């Protein structure tokens, strides 16, 4: 699906001096957690899983009330099952603060890593290599595991959740101009003709530029699968952007064609902040959005009659984007046995059911999705179906630079 490329530190993160300090404190990342567990344990002779009142520190970023309740439930269960304490270290500026902790050699035993940042942190050597069999990674969606696999094929994080894009449509607005959900094409090749017709009908009924046929995000995190289709990726082996190849330009032209035709508009074009607001206020008929918008629509825009369908095919391939976060183990942790046990629990079917049900995200493994009965909710069912074919949001260590270049290219 894509070529994995990693490079050393770039302007995305800290200065060269900080990177050197981080690399120096990272230790040998070839040391597996399984091999180092015995050395890190101070509970000799204790029963398996009994950590004798020790404390494991878990680095996370803050969330909403539902996420806080879910992580606290996991904490409570783990403490009860393992006779230990879990200290949740909540960062308010995650990437800045945890890098400072790496430099100071005070990082948590186990911590969140966003897939978009994994190439950077992997290059620093601050995480242990994990044994796929030990963490049951065969049960996880392969594309999500790949997002946390380094250039040498070593897995360094276990996915803890995911979100995907799907196509949302306003049923009432469609029907008001003579369309139904079945008329929305399943192939991007048919989008321009359909959206042009839809926009013309909307303008005739509601007035010019009152309601958009479709909104999109001017961001690679949403459009990467289109630009990257049929290529070896948007970065070369050295991590430099490759945005001028014929296929990339052709894919870019496809997006520009929809924008120039006036059938793809950004929420800001409508004077609004994001897709959810544009859709919820009835200012757009169709949007491609992540499952996080579902709660917003149910709570803040409950009068909107909407449906959800899979993302359209592009050049014969079914795509979506996914946004995943994993747990990594600090290479210098003195509690690797506890960190490992924490990951195994929170990424088990039981742990994921607690976390994903509470936090409103998708489980990274199919058996957990089945246990959660995501198929019983038509919205969650579509988003879950998109997981296996999704492209995780990740683009080497120069992600922000490449994304800015892309945004500057679009009108």
Q: Model-predicted segments: where are they?
A:
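Conserved C-terminal helix/tail region of periplasmic/extracytoplasmic solute-binding proteins
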Residues: 55, 175, 181, 200, ...
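Short, low-complexity disordered leader/linker segments with a strong preference
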Residues: 1-57, 367
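Long, aromatic- and glycine/proline-rich binding clefts that accommodate carbohydrate-like moieties
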Residues: 146-148, 302, 306-309, 357-408
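Extracytoplasmic "Venus flytrap"/periplasmic binding protein-like
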Residues: 73-143, 172-178, 183-186, 278, ...
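Glycine-centered hinge/linker elements that transmit conformational signals in sensory
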Residues: 194-197, 239-268
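Extracytoplasmic/periplasmic solute-binding protein
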Residues: 44-46, 156-160, 165, 190-241, ...
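Extracytoplasmic/periplasmic substrate-binding proteins
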Residues: 61, 111, 118, 221-222, ...
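Hinge/lid segment of periplasmic solute-binding proteins
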Residues: 40-50, 114-166, 192, 207, ...
């Amino acid at each position: 699906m894509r070529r994995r490329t990693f490079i050393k530190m770039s302007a995305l993160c800290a200065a060269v001096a900080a990177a050197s300090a981080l690399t120096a404190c990272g230790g040998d990342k070839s040391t597996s957690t399984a091999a180092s567990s015995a050395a890190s344990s101070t509970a000799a002779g204790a029963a398996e899983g009994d950590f004798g009142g020790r404390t494991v520190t878990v680095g996370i970023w803050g969330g909403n009330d539902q996420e806080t309740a879910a992580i606290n439930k996991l904490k409570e269960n783990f403490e009860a099952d393992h006779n230990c304490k879990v200290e949740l270290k909540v960062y308010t500026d995650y990437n800045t603060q945890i890098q400072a902790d790496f430099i100071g050699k005070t990082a948590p035993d186990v911590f969140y890593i966003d897939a978009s940042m994994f190439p950077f942190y992997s290059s620093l050597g601050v995480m242990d290599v994990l044994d796929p069999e030990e963490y049951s990674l065969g049960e996880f969606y392969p594309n999500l595991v790949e997002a946390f696999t380094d250039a040498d094929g070593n897995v360094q994080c276990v996915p803890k959740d995911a979100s995907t894009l799907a196509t949302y449509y306003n049923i009432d607005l469609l029907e008001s101009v003579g369309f139904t959900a079945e008329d929305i094409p399943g192939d991007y090749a048919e989008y321009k003709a359909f959206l042009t017709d839809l926009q013309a009908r909307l303008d005739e009924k509601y007035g010019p530029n009152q309601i958009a046929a479709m909104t999109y995000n001017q961001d690679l995190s949403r459009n990467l699968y289109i630009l990257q289709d049929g290529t070896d990726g948007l970065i070369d082996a050295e991590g430099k952007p490759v945005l001028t190849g014929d296929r990339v330009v052709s894919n870019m032209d496809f997006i520009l064609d929809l924008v120039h035709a006036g059938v793809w508009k950004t929420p800001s074009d409508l004077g609004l902040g994001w897709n959810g607001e544009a859709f919820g206020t009835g200012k757009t008929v169709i949007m491609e959005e992540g499952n996080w918008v579902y709660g917003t629509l149910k709570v803040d825009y409950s009068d909107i009659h909407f449906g959800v369908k899979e993302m359209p095919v592009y050049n014969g391939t079914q795509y979506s984007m996914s946004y995943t976060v994993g747990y990594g183990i600090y290479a210098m942790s003195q509690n690797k046995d506890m960190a490992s046990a924490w990951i195994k629990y929170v990424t088990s079917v039981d742990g994921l059911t607690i976390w994903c049900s509470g936090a409103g995200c998708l489980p990274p493994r199919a058996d957990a999705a089945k246990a959660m009965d995501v198929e019983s909710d038509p919205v969650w069912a579509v988003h879950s179906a998109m997981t296996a074919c999704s492209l995780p949001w990740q683009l080497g260590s120069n992600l922000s630079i490449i994304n800015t270049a892309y945004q500057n290219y679009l009108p």
